[in-house]
A protein has these predicted regions:
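N-terminal secretory signal peptides that target proteins for export/translocation
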Residues: 1-3
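Sec-dependent N-terminal signal peptides
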Residues: 6-15
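C-terminal motif of bacterial Sec signal peptides marking the signal peptidase cleavage site
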Residues: 17-20
Length: 224
C-alpha cells in the first residue's frame, strides 16, 4: 500500500510539472505593423463591362463601358452605339477598374518595380509614376460578331499603360493571334487621396486555363 501511494504521488508531481511547463511556453505574437496581403479575382470576361474596385473595402461594381462605341469590319464602320452614363454613376469609392486585361485608375499614378514579391517592396518608388492617358479605339467592347469579322471598340477610353503591362501579349502569326504570360512585377499605385497600393497580378484565366479575362491579383492597400 505504501509503495502504491508513493507511485501515485510521483504521478501527481509529474503531471504538475508538465502543466507548469505548458503554461510557461510563450504564445506567438503577431508582428506589430505587419500588413497582410489580400487576394481578389475579377471576372472581366464580358468585353462590354468594367469592374470598379475599392481596394480598401474589397467592394466591386460592374458597369457598361460608358463611352460611345463603333463597330468595324476591317476599316469599314458597321454600326455606332451612343454613350450611356458616366463614371459619376459608380456608387462605390473606387481605386482601379479592370476590363478584360485593361486597367485604369481613379486619377492615380502607377509605376512598375523590379520586385516580384509584394513584401520585397518596403519603400515606395520616388519617381517613374505614370498617370492614365486617353486612347481611341483601343478598348474592345463587342466581340459578339467576331466570326463575321466585326469588332466593336470604345471610341475613347482612359487607360493606365503601366498597369496594362501586367500581362504580356506574344503574337503567334496564326490562330489564336496571341499567347500570354505574366510580367510577374509588383506595381505601386498612388491615389489622389494620398493612399497607395502595391499590386501583383497572378493569373489572367479561370481555373481551367481555357477562359481568359478572369483576373487574379494580390495587393496591399495603405490608407493615407
Amino acid at each position: 500500500m505504501k509503495m502504491k501511494n508513493l507511485m501515485m504521488l510521483a504521478l501527481v508531481v509529474c503531471s504538475m510539472m508538465m502543466v507548469g511547463c505548458s503554461e510557461d511556453k510563450p504564445e506567438p505574437k503577431p508582428t506589430p505593423g505587419k500588413t497582410v496581403a489580400k487576394k481578389m479575382t475579377v471576372d472581366a470576361t464580358n468585353y462590354a463591362d468594367w469592374t470598379y474596385i475599392n481596394l480598401e473595402t474589397g467592394e466591386t461594381e460592374v458597369h457598361r463601358d460608358f463611352s460611345s462605341w463603333t463597330s468595324y469590319k476591317r476599316d469599314t464602320v458597321i454600326s455606332r452605339t451612343p454613350a450611356k452614363g458616366s463614371e459619376a454613376d459608380v456608387k462605390i469609392k473606387w481605386h482601379i477598374a479592370i476590363h478584360y486585361f485593361d486597367v485604369k485608375t481613379n486619377a492615380g499614378e502607377a509605376v512598375a518595380t523590379t520586385e516580384t514579391e509584394l513584401d520585397k517592396v518596403t519603400t515606395l518608388p520616388t519617381a517613374g509614376y505614370k498617370a492614365d492617358t486617353l486612347v481611341r479605339k483601343r478598348v474592345i467592347t463587342d466581340m459578339s460578331k467576331m466570326m463575321q469579322g466585326i469588332i466593336g471598340y470604345a471610341d475613347q477610353s482612359s487607360l493606365n499603360a503601366t498597369l496594362g503591362g501586367w500581362v504580356i501579349r506574344i503574337p503567334t502569326g496564326t490562330m489564336p493571334p496571341y499567347t500570354y504570360k505574366l510580367s510577374e512585377k509588383v506595381y505601386v499605385v498612388k491615389f489622389k487621396s494620398g493612399a497607395n497600393a502595391k499590386l501583383k497580378f497572378t493569373d489572367y484565366s479561370d481555373a481551367t486555363g481555357q477562359k481568359n479575362g478572369v483576373v487574379t491579383f494580390s495587393y496591399v492597400y495603405q490608407a493615407k
